[in-house]
Amino acid sequence: MTKHQFKLSDPRLLSRIGYQFKQPELLQLALTHRSVSHKYNYERLEFLGDSLLGMIIANYLYHAYPHENEGRLTRMRATLVRQEALGKIATDLQLSRCLILSTGELKSGGHHRESILADTVEAIIGAIYLDSSDLNLLKDIVLKWYTPYLDHIEPTDQLKDPKSRLQEYLQARKKPLPVYEVVDIQGDAPHQHFKVECLVDGLSKIHGEGASRRFAEQAAAAEILKLLEQ
């Protein structure tokens, strides 16, 4: 079994995505960067996924904000589909450790590059659609990925990451700020995997994992927000 096959069959990856592929080769293609192959890579899937994502988010905003004008809806959509937002989705899905990159791209830190992570999210969207041929299913999956962000976006807001939102949540309630601590690092650079512990007053310690300390902290903050906002 190759390293890439292991990743594709990893139930944790499929669980995070929220979809079981009938054609796993589509997921492999969605994770394959152009540096590996000029012909067999995610770029065509990214093209498809970009259009599908724009439609899904536009449809959501149209129905969720019936009184907003076209200009504000356009700005909200742009906020939700821009590279930074997709990078956050990729962090939540822990895609950085699953990317299929050339040795050179990997050594240069490509698995942390926001543009590559964002492209991969769009490619996975395209792959799910081709595998399922079910637009409603795809919509449900994508909106589930976006739940932490859709619950907070307003027509005049910019998308905020989980750490920023958690800090604002606690400050608004005059509570101590969260404390983050790295409790485990596995592997050697650039293949390290971090586990971070986050402590918030009144809650049990919550852990987050990721391919960098920043990603792990964001994952932990996202989990705490889910508990606080229940």
UniProtKB/Swiss-Prot annotation:
For this protein, the record's SUPFAM superfamilies field holds: dsRNA-binding domain-like, RNase III domain-like
The active site of this protein is located at: D50, E122
Query: Which Gene3D superfamilies does this UniProt record tie to the protein?
Result: 3.30.160.20, Ribonuclease III domain
Where Mg(2+) binds, per the record, is at E46, D119, E122
Q: Does the keyword Nuclease apply?
A: yes
Keyword terms, alphabetized: Cytoplasm, Endonuclease, Hydrolase, Magnesium, Metal-binding, mRNA processing, Nuclease, RNA-binding, rRNA processing, rRNA-binding, tRNA processing
GO BP terms, alphabetized: mRNA processing; rRNA processing; tRNA processing
Q: What is its EC number?
A: 3.1.26.3
Coiled coil location: none
A Gene Ontology cellular component where this protein is annotated is:
cytoplasm
What cofactor does this one take?
Answer: Mg(2+)
- What PROSITE patterns does its record include? DS_RBD (PS50137), RNASE_3_1 (PS00517), RNASE_3_2 (PS50142)
Please tell me which top-level EC class this enzyme sits in: hydrolase
* RNase III domain boundaries: 10-133
Which family does this protein fall into? Answer: Belongs to the ribonuclease III family.
Under the heading NCBIfam families, the entry gives: RNaseIII
Stated name of the protein: Ribonuclease 3
Organism whose genome encodes this protein: Acinetobacter baumannii (strain SDF)
